[in-house]
């Protein structure tokens, strides 16, 4: 698994800024999809009040997608062949994963490799390292047709649908 060092700032006594934590982010797999890794880097649930403590909430309490006003900061690793249908595989399983719609605006940055964005109208756009995507809550899917692993970071901002 790809590790990520995560440095989190916070306010200590007297509201003086400090490093609240410095360590590895939690990385998990995705059931049924070997090679997919999700690093949950940080999350907020909105509410309008800034929590400058730098104390991480238990990520197991958070839904993957944020509520309105909430955010999720994730790094996702996509293995070669992700989102491409193996002729012997259950096609509906790939279709469910490939195309999805969320009540979020997602800001993404490709860090390594390439991913192909697939939209309902059949259009596709291939993103490479350094490219950015603003995904505005529309149905979309991802494919990695390259022979190398793709890595992207996303900030998901929750909205009412």
Where are each of the predicted segments found?
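A short beta-strand-loop-beta hairpin characteristic of the jelly-roll/cupin
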Residues: 93-102, 107-128
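Double-stranded beta-helix
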Residues: 6-12, 16-21, 27, 145-161
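Short, electropositive, low-hydrophobicity segments enriched in small/polar residues
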Residues: 14, 39, 112, 117, ...
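Ligand-binding loop in jelly-roll beta-barrel domains
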Residues: 68-72, 116, 124, 128-131, ...
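Short, surface-exposed charged micro-motifs
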Residues: 7-8, 107, 141
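A short glycine-rich, His/Asp/Glu-containing loop-to-beta-strand
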Residues: 20-98, 104-105, 159-160
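Short, small/polar residue-rich loop motifs at catalytic or cofactor-binding pockets
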Residues: 3-5, 102-103
């Amino acid at each position: 698994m790809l590790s990520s060092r995560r440095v989190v700032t916070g306010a200590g006594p007297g509201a003086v800024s400090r490093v609240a934590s410095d360590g590895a982010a939690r990385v998990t797999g995705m059931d049924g999809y070997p090679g997919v890794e999700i690093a949950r880097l940080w999350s907020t649930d909105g509410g309008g009040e800034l929590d400058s403590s730098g104390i991480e909430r238990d990520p197991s309490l958070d839904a993957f997608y944020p509520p309105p006003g909430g955010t999720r900061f994730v790094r996702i690793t996509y293995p070669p062949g992700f989102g491409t249908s193996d002729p012997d595989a259950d096609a509906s399983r790939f279709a469910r994963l490939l195309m999805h719609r969320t009540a979020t605006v997602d800001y993404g940055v490709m860090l390594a490799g390439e991913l192909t964005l697939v939209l309902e109208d059949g259009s596709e756009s291939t993103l490479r390292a350094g490219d950015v995507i603003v995904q505005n809550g529309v149905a979309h899917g991802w494919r990695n047709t390259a022979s190398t692993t793709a890595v992207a970071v996303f900030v998901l901002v929750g909205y009412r649908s």
